[in-house]
Amino acid sequence: MSRDPTGVGARWAIMIVSLGVTASSFLFINGVAFLIPRLENARGTPLSHAGLLASMPSWGLVVTMFAWGYLLDHVGERMVMAVGSALTAAAAYAAASVHSLLWIGVFLFLGGMAAGGCNSAGGRLVSGWFPPQQRGLAMGIRQTAQPLGIASGALVIPELAERGVHAGLMFPAVVCTLAAVASVLGIVDPPRKSRTKASEQELASPYRGSSILWRIHAASALLMMPQTVTVTFMLVWLINHHGWSVAQAGVLVTISQLLGALGRVAVGRWSDHVGSRMRPVRLIAAAAAATLFLLAAVDNEGSRYDVLLMIAISVIAVLDNGLEATAITEYAGPYWSGRALGIQNTTQRLMAAAGPPLFGSLITTAAYPTAWALCGVFPLAAVPLVPVRLLPPGLETRARRQSVRRHRWWQAVRCHAWPNGPRRPGPPGQPRRVRQGGTAITPPT
């Protein structure tokens, strides 16, 4: 690819390559969860131990995310994505070549350390190539990488694992190898001023004197728990709790992740339209909490709605990531966005690493409904933390226009005679005629 892609088609081509490379890293990070049925059946591995093994890539991510972000700010996206994908592939091949679960866990941990740079680099790459009015949509498409990576793992790994754990691990190894080659051939860093030409204000830390980024980090970390829990345990829940076959459960998980991918594109476009990344995040958090509480209420009751609710939360739980990543790159700027995304992904991965073993133990000792109810507390706690007043640079006018529309609608539906009272029955905005004495009468029909 040309080293100076200025056309619209070239920008979208870079975004597609970035999507594929990031999807390969998420395939490795989340794919181990689809080995759990094989580990339980063939090796008798307890669910808590299998959950710990599935979390090892996330623990590796936690260790290196900030370091990858620092490197990203200094060497650029292409180098980080190529090197990270190659090292992840090497770790996956190593994990597939050993028999001991201990050594498999070690290599999964090392692979997680290597995979840490792809997500941050891919997000910053897309943010750098697209203008504000297209950034939410472009980032939403790029953020389909996670559900697409998980969907491919759910479709392929359980079937390969029927031949053994090692066969299942070879799939992410091959895909990450292809991603490393694609990074070298298809990624071009967006044009930026060198750090030596940047002003002191541009190089200043966005964390100084502001809690905006910390609030986004905290909210996104809390919203990561439903995503982690559903990805890790949906397959085994369908197999053990509902008696589904491995193939049937894998197909449903795949469909759920594909719906989540489409949802990410939709909410990205939504954020461009309303001129805000954070208002949709707050609504997503509230919807995730409500869905998990409903799932906890109907699970074990023999209801036919529990599977539908599981699909719903699997979709809702993945919707917010692209919005948060976009807001961070816009707020932090080109010289701090790598480190800010590194911190963001570190907080998310701490939750992702802690979730499988903790909830695996809870499911074993209590039951699935208890786990769903506790999981619902996390997105509920995120609701007040979301900084909804944060406006994307370049979209402030659009956001204010939306606010004016909402204000006018509210003025229309309020009671004109008593502004602080409830709205009178009837169509919104219906005026009330007032007699000379001040008594309101019903308008003619």
UniProtKB/Swiss-Prot annotation:
This protein's UniProt keywords: Cell membrane, Membrane, Transmembrane, Transmembrane helix, Transport
GO molecular function, one term: transmembrane transporter activity
Location in or out of the cell: Cell membrane
Membrane-spanning segments: 16-36, 52-72, 98-118, 168-188, 219-239, 243-263, 283-303, 366-386
Pfam families: MFS_1
Annotated CDD domains: MFS_MT3072_like
Chain spans, region Disordered: 417-445
Topology within the bilayer: Multi-pass membrane protein
Chief location bin: membrane
Family under the similarity heading: Belongs to the major facilitator superfamily.
Protein name stated in the entry: Uncharacterized MFS-type transporter Rv2994
Organism: Mycobacterium tuberculosis (strain ATCC 25618 / H37Rv)
